[in-house]
Amino acid sequence: MSRADGAAIPGVSRRQFLGLGWFPWLAPRHIGLAGARFRILRNGRSQRRYLRIHGNEETARRVLERHMETHEGIAYVIESRTRVVAVESLKLDPNRMFSRVGAEANLTLLNPGAAAEQVRRALGVLDRGREKLVRALTPPKGGVTIALHNNSSGYSVAAEVPISDRSSLRQPGIPHAFFLCTDPRDFEVLKTSPYNVVLQQHGPEDGSLSRLAAARGFRYVNLEVAAGEAERQWEMLNWLEWFMG
């Protein structure tokens, strides 16, 4: 797309310009895959993408919605109130649906009595719709996808260190708060922070978005804090925004 003076507008096609530049209200407000439906929040034209994928992680929702009031980017906020969603009447962790292998393992785990045919149908639904959601969550070149998560007493950075390529534990006494990234250049920046951080480029396939990001080579940062620690998550997100390009 070009301006009237002939100068190109980088990264914007004519269709995008007409559909979103002149008529921003035409941009979709929701996107989904199977039982996972996401509300889309837009602010400006930043290359950042944000995600809150688990419906029971209320701290992450509040922090992300607050963040989007003052920062540019596109955020995807799941509308479910529960950790799992339904696919063909089966339970599925939405952060295990980004590969067929991961989705099948999770469907089998969460639905031990399900018939093989029912699992097969659920996988078919995911296979047909997965790429559209992945395209939305993938940042433009040079951008980054930031996922906000909350955890409980049963999970911490200690579970990630053994399967990580590198780690920097600046706050070993606060193991529930950490960054997980997939790009070594981002790790070099994040390790200068006062927070815990791990780099995972070669973790075992589990259907998560972080594994997909590592496989496809796009920048991804997962920001984990304990449930209820909104101010800590807000502080870490602001650090990330300030210091990461």
Whereabouts are the PLM-identified features?
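C-terminal segment of N-terminal export signals and the immediately downstream linker at the start
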Residues: P10-R15, P28-R29, A34-A36
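N-terminal secretory signal peptides and thylakoid transit peptides that target proteins
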Residues: R3-P24
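Catalytic-site microenvironment of enzymes
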Residues: P28, G35-R37, E58-V63, Y195, ...
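Active-site-adjacent mobile loop/cap segments within catalytic or ligand-binding domains
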Residues: Q200-G245
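Anion (oxyanion) recognition and catalysis
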Residues: M68-E69, K191, A214
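Hydrophobic/aromatic beta-strand patches that form the interior of the parallel beta-sheet core
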Residues: Y76, I146, V198, V221-L223
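N-terminal catalytic or cofactor-binding beta/alpha core of small enzyme domains
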Residues: H30-T182
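Active-site-adjacent substrate-binding region
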Residues: I174-Q201
